[in-house]
């Protein structure tokens, strides 16, 4: 498309690039000043306009009349047809400068005769406002060629002026701006690209040093970052150490929502499995003081008329310890000392997530005896005792049961209430109280198939069931044995209740939680009618009292006591034995000897 030659009225000019001069073009007093050349103008389709004191230049090389601002004569308006074409071209988006090449240069228009303006005068002249860019704005690079128009006609040729430093500075500034935008785009999250920077060494020589440094600073505050580094760089050893750290401190991880919520379901399962997967489960026992040890006892008297003998000095009670059993050596050994602050008399005990919890109890003796609401926790993987959130109500002779990651404190002396502890919120919340008419003191409780069962003690042969989903209690069928119950455990969907028979020993009654039926499983003769206290490990039920440590094995449809008797616990003659199961770490002496 060919455009006619016509003058343009003065218009505001936007910021643009400077058209550079073609080597060989004359540079003299008639050329434009640097202050005006710093913003290169744009032209309409087919014509490239150069601005200067010499006027406007057409691409065809014909000089045009100067505008009224230059020579004082008004410029005629362009024909209507050309005005419309200019409007359409202005509405198009401007092309990037890098895409607009240059063609051969045209000689600049001659300046009319007259005195040349001095350099200071030219600097003092106001810089005219730049026009809006057109689509065919000239590219700043003199090595590029003109792109043909859509109609197929060649575009006009652009005149240039001397490549001033100011012009080159403006072009480089725009290039730097484009490069900056590109880098910002590449740095956006999402993996569109990688900004060129310091490259990682191809060898992995630095990674062992980095992993060693991360191991030194590994704690619960940095474990997520270290785990991400280990997974990204293929460091299974470092990842395993991070999992082990979180597993060793599971209660703190559960109580930190910022940490626990950022773990995936697979990570949570792995951390939980490590609590019991890095050692061997062992049988443990804690001797709880008898409820009547703190009561008054009369002094022995001699023959009539004689003064009673002087009372022997009262010795301080020995510190309580947790003990564990070594089945290969058939011996018991102490594991750790129980804190003196923990009131053991009448407390509840259970294990959850390989932690041992002690809750409630009676502190003091006589008229100063008070119930406690404190809860203590022992971590066998770190050998550390700690305290968790106290219960809402002080309790003694309660039962503590773990179910689905929650602790349930059930009943107590003169109490029908129940409350539940969630380690993730570190809070106790009340639950449905036991049915009216029950008196849950010295009772037994166990969890089986998602429900909690309570029997024994002052409940005698009654069996109560609590559903956490419904938060409600109901009563199960009575046991066929109306004898005194000593303990109850769950194994394989069945409840095994150990009743005490005077002059005979212990009788085991089995309850099917699906069919709701009772049956007699086995019996065990005992030298003395001492209650049995039980716990389960695998398919074996360990039954303890001060005289015997027996094993009751359930295999398939048969359940019977084993003939081999284990070493009785030697220190349980003055208290109540409370057995439990814990998994000790491999570094423990008992495990290393095995």
Swiss-Prot record:
Source organism: Homo sapiens
Keyword Transmembrane: no
Keywords: Kelch repeat, Repeat
Stretches with biased composition (Low complexity): 116-126
Extent of the Kelch repeats: 306-354, 355-405, 406-448, 451-493, 495-538
UniProt biased composition (Pro residues): 104-115
Biased composition annotated in UniProt, kind: Polar residues: 64-74
Gene3D superfamilies: Kelch-type beta propeller (2.120.10.80)
Gly residues bias spans: 49-58
Keyword Cell inner membrane (UniProt): no
The protein, known as: Kelch domain-containing protein 7B
